A protein has these predicted regions:
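Cleavable N-terminal targeting peptides that direct proteins into the secretory/outer-membrane pathway or into
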Residues: 1-23
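N-terminal periplasmic "start-of-domain" segments of outer-membrane beta-barrel proteins
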Residues: 29-62, 89, 132
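Flexible glycine-/small-residue-rich
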Residues: 37-39, 92-96, 104-106, 136, ...
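Short beta-strands and strand-coil junctions in structured, solvent-facing domains, enriched
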Residues: 41-42, 78, 99, 109-110, ...
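Short acidic/polar hinge/loop motifs at secondary-structure boundaries
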Residues: 91, 108-136
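A beta-strand signature from Gram-negative outer-membrane beta-barrel systems
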Residues: 123-168
Length: 170
């Protein structure tokens, strides 16, 4: 039996493996992928507000999304420390944060256990965002069961072709 196992192992090691035609200099250009999530439109029976990148920068010098959304109707925020940085809480139409569905490019940011979003873990988020849609009240069904009170749908900016920087000195 040992001889048979030894012979089988020897045959397995000695069989040459072929890796197909690999050309390390060949570069393939792939099609771009667009990640999108559904948003409320004109004919959707949901009250919503859209904010683009310029509007976020205008109302939000500290790069806190909670602080920027506090200027929208039916939104009440509490910010610890008063600077806009750190732990923040938000209610929309009196509904607490655990019933607000928050997505970034269609990916849910709500905590799996408490359904809250810990905004302190994602600082300077508004500098990465291209647009935000705040749906007040019952959201679209594709936003999931967390959209009972409201939905915040964010999409990030696309990759630019030239380098740039942004400085805000207040």
């Amino acid at each position: 039996m040992r001889g048979f196992l030894f012979f089988g192992a020897l045959c397995a090691v000695s069989v040459p493996t072929f890796a197909g035609d690999v050309n390390p200099d060949k570069i393939e250009k792939l099609d771009s992928v667009i990640v999108s999530a559904s948003r409320a439109g004109e004919n959707t029976p949901v009250t919503f507000t859209n904010l683009n990148k310029e509007e976020l920068r205008k109302v939000n010098p500290m790069n806190s999304l909670v602080q920027a959304l506090s200027l929208q109707p039916s939104v009440v925020t509490s910010l610890e420390g008063g600077t806009g940085l750190g732990y923040s809480k938000m209610t929309v139409r009196g509904v607490k944060g655990s019933q607000i569905n928050v997505t970034l490019n269609g990916i849910t940011l709500n905590d799996a256990e408490s359904q809250e979003v810990f905004w302190v873990n994602i600082p300077a988020l508004t500098s990465l965002i291209n647009s935000v849609q705040l749906q007040r009240g019952l959201g679209t069904s594709s936003n999931g069961p967390g959209a009972f009170g409201a939905s915040i749908n964010m999409s990030t900016a696309s990759v630019g072709t030239s380098p740039f920087g942004y400085v805000n000195v207040a």
